[in-house]
C-alpha cells in the first residue's frame, strides 16, 4: 500500500521557494511552540507534531535531500509501481532502479560502469575564505601589519558544533531502526532484487538528534565578524597568496577550520615603475640644466626625498643609480633606485634667447640656419 506523503513545506509553514534562512526561522519558532514539555495536557499530540517538525527540517535544511524531495516527493522511501495504459510501468522501473541502486539498470547486468560510492556524513574541513588587501610601496620596504575585518562561520558556542540542542541527546533513527542501513527488496520485470544502502536520514550512524540546536538550527556553525592583523612580508609581488591556517570557516561535524587566503594587491605608485627589487623614476630637466649641471629632488619609496646631482654636460636618457634605495629582495638586501634623466628641448624661443644662442653657436663654430 502506498504511503501517504508528507508536505514538509506545509508542516513548517513556509512556501516552496523559501530560503534556508526562512526555513531555519520557521523551525526555531515551531520547536519552541510544540515542545512536548509545553503541552503536558496533550503530550502525545505534541510529540507527534514535534517529530514531524524535526523530520521536515532535516529534509528541507539539506540541499541534496530537499532537491530529491522537490523532485520525487520523498526522501529515502520509494514509491510503488502501477501499470498504466501509456506504458509508464517500465519507465518507472528503469527510473526508480537508478534511484535505488545509484546505477543505470544496464550497467548492473552488463557491467559498463563501477558502482558509485554511497554518500556518508563525516567530519569535513571548513571552507577557505579569500580576502584581498591593498598595500603601498612603502609597506613593501620593511613589511607591514594590516588590520582586516571579515565574516566567517565559527563553531556554535551553544552546541559546540554538534548541531544538537544541549541535553537533548540522540534517538534511534526511525527510518533505519538504528542500524544505519536501509534494506530494500524489489520484484520487477527482471526478477527479485535485494539491495542495502546507507540510511540518508542519519548518514549511516543510526542516530538522529532529538532536537536541533536553537542557535545554529542544526548546522553547528554561526556567522561572526572577525578582526585580525595580517603580517605582510617585505617586497611581496602583486597577486601573492598568503595562507593563514585556521583563519577560514569552521568545519562540519567536528572537522577542522579552513584557511584564510590573503591575496595581496600592490597599489600602483604613479612616481615609480617596479622592476624586481629595483624602482625606476623618470625626471625631466631643461636643456640648459643638462648643459650647465643642476641638482634635482628625487622621492623615496618609504617617504621623504633625496637630492641627486646632475653634472654639467649630462646627455639625454642618462641613467643614474642610487644604491640601496629600492625594495628589499628575498634575502633582505635592498635594490636600487634608478633615475632616468630626460632632457627637454624647447620648441620655440624668444627673440632674446635666439640671439644669445646664435652668438654662442658662432663662438663654437657651429653652423646654424
From Swiss-Prot:
- A GO term, aspect molecular function: heat shock protein binding
Q: Which residues bind Zn(2+) 1?
A: 156, 159, 213, 216
Origin superkingdom: Bacteria
Q: Which cofactor does it need?
A: Zn(2+)
SUPFAM superfamilies associated with the record:
Chaperone J-domain, DnaJ/Hsp40 cysteine-rich domain, HSP40/DnaJ peptide-binding domain
Zn finger limits (CR-type): 143-225
Which regions does the record annotate with the repeat CXXCXGXG motif? 156-163, 173-180, 199-206, 213-220
- What are the binding positions for Zn(2+) 2 in this chain? 173, 176, 199, 202
How does this polypeptide assemble, per the annotation? Answer: Homodimer.
Function of the molecule: Participates actively in the response to hyperosmotic and heat shock by preventing the aggregation of stress-denatured proteins and by disaggregating proteins, also in an autonomous, DnaK-independent fashion. Unfolded proteins bind initially to DnaJ; upon interaction with the DnaJ-bound protein, DnaK hydrolyzes its bound ATP, resulting in the formation of a stable complex. GrpE releases ADP from DnaK; ATP binding to DnaK triggers the release of the substrate protein, thus completing the reaction cycle.
What is the name attached to this protein's record?
A: Chaperone protein DnaJ
Q: Which organism is this entry from? A: Thermotoga maritima (strain ATCC 43589 / DSM 3109 / JCM 10099 / NBRC 100826 / MSB8)
Task: Tell me the lineage of the source organism.
Answer: Bacteria, Thermotogati, Thermotogota, Thermotogae, Thermotogales
Amino acid at each position: 500500500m502506498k504511503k501517504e506523503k508528507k508536505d514538509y513545506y506545509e508542516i513548517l509553514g513556509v512556501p516552496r521557494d523559501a530560503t534556508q534562512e526562512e526555513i531555519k526561522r520557521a523551525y526555531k519558532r515551531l520547536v519552541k511552540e510544540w515542545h512536548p514539555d509545553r503541552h503536558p495536557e496533550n503530550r502525545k499530540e505534541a510529540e507527534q507534531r514535534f517529530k514531524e517538525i524535526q523530520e521536515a527540517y532535516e529534509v528541507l535544511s539539506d540541499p541534496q535531500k530537499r532537491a530529491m524531495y522537490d523532485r520525487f516527493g520523498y526522501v529515502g522511501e520509494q514509491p510503488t509501481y502501477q501499470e498504466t495504459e501509456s506504458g509508464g510501468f517500465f519507465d518507472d522501473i528503469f527510473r526508480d532502479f537508478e534511484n535505488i541502486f545509484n546505477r543505470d539498470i544496464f550497467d548492473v547486468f552488463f557491467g559498463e560502469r563501477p558502482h558509485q560510492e554511497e554518500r556518508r556524513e563525516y567530519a569535513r574541513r571548513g571552507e577557505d575564505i579569500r580576502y584581498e588587501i591593498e598595500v603601498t610601496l612603502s609597506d613593501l620596504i620593511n613589511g607591514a601589519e594590516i588590520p582586516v575585518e571579515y565574516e566567517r562561520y565559527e563553531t556554535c558556542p551553544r552546541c559546540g558544533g554538534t548541531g544538537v540542542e544541549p541535553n537533548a541527546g540522540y534517538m534511534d533513527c526511525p527510518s533505519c531502526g538504528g542500524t544505519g542501513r536501509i534494506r530494500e527488496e524489489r520484484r520487477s520485470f527482471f526478477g527479485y532484487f535485494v539491495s542495502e544502502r546507507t540510511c540518508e536520514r542519519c548518514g549511516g550512524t543510526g542516530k538522529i538528534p532529538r532536537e536541533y540546536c536553537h542557535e545554529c538550527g542544526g548546522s553547528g556553525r554561526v556567522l561572526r565578524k572577525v578582526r585580525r592583523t595580517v603580517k605582510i612580508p617585505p617586497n611581496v609581488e602583486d597577486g601573492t597568496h598568503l595562507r593563514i591556517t585556521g583563519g577560514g570557516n569552521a568545519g562540519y561535524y567536528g572537522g577542522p577550520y579552513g584557511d584564510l587566503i590573503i591575496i595581496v594587491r600592490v597599489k600602483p605608485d604613479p612616481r615609480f615603475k617596479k622592476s624586481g627589487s629595483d624602482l625606476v623614476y623618470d625626471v625631466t630637466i631643461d636643456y640648459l640644466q643638462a648643459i650647465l649641471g643642476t641638482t634635482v629632488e628625487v622621492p623615496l619609496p618609504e617617504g621623504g626625498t633625496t637630492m641627486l646631482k646632475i653634472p654639467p654636460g649630462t646627455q639625454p636618457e642618462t641613467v643614474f643609480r642610487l644604491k640601496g634605495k629600492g625594495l628589499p629582495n628575498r634575502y633582505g638586501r635592498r635594490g636600487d633606485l634608478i633615475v632616468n634623466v630626460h632632457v627637454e628641448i624647447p620648441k620655440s624661443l624668444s627673440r632674446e634667447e635666439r640671439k644669445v644662442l646664435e652668438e654662442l653657436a658662432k663662438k663654437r663654430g657651429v653652423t646654424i640656419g
